[in-house]
C-alpha cells in the first residue's frame, strides 16, 4: 500500500526493552531485533499492559539515530504509556517528542515480509529528505494479530 497520510502526534512516553543496532548489523547473523522480540514475549508484560486499554498496541520504536539510516540507533519494543507513568527496569522509558509523521501502511501479508517491504519503500520515498530521525515507530494493533495476514502502520517523523 505505502504512504497513507500525514498526522501530528503530541509528546508520547514509551516503555519497553531496548537494544542498540544498525541496518547493516540487522542484515547479518549478528542481528539483534529478533532476539529482542523474543525477550519481550518471554517477559511478564503485565507491567507494560496493566494500565492499558484492552486493545493497547505493541510498538517497535526507532530512536537515538547516530547517522540517519547509516549508523546505529536504539530499537525498542514495548507500548506507549500515560506520560506520568515511569516503569522500573528492565524497561527503558523514552520520551518521543511531538512531531508531524508520515504514516505508511503495509499490505496484508506475512509479518516478516511486510515490515521490511514497507521500510524499503520508506528508504526510497521521494520525500525522505523530510525525515527528522527524532523517533519513528511501527504500530502492531489488532490488524497484526494474525502473523500470516498482518498489516502494520509505520510512523516516520518528518519536518512539517
Curated annotation (Swiss-Prot):
Gene3D superfamilies xref list: Regulatory factor, effector binding domain
SUPFAM superfamilies: Probable bacterial effector-binding domain
UniProt superkingdom: Bacteria
PANTHER family noted in UniProt: TRANSCRIPTIONAL REGULATOR PROTEIN YOBU-RELATED (PTHR36444:SF2)
Protein name: Putative transcriptional regulator protein YobU
Higher taxonomy: Bacteria, Bacillati, Bacillota, Bacilli, Bacillales
Amino acid at each position: 500500500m505505502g504512504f497513507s497520510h500525514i498526522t501530528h502526534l503530541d509528546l508520547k512516553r514509551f516503555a519497553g526493552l531496548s537494544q542498540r543496532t544498525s541496518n547493516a548489523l540487522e542484515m547479518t547473523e549478528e542481528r539483534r531485533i529478533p532476539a529482542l522480540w523474543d525477550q519481550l514475549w518471554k517477559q511478564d508484560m503485565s507491567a507494560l499492559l496493566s494500565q492499558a486499554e484492552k486493545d493497547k498496541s505493541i510498538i517497535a520504536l526507532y530512536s537515538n539515530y547516530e547517522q540517519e539510516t547509516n549508523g546505529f540507533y536504539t530499537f525498542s519494543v514495548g507500548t506507549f504509556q500515560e506520560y506520568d507513568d515511569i516503569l522500573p527496569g528492565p524497561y527503558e522509558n523514552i520520551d518521543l517528542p511531538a512531531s508531524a509523521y508520515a504514516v505508511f501502511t503495509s499490505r496484508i501479508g506475512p509479518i516478516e515480509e511486510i515490515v521490511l517491504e514497507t521500510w524499503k519503500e520508506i528508504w526510497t520515498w521521494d520525500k525522505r529528505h523530510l525525515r527528522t530521525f527524532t523517533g519513528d515507530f511501527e504500530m502492531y494493533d489488532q490488524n497484526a494479530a494474525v502473523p500470516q495476514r498482518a498489516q502494520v502502520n509505520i510512523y516516520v517523523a518528518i519536518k512539517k
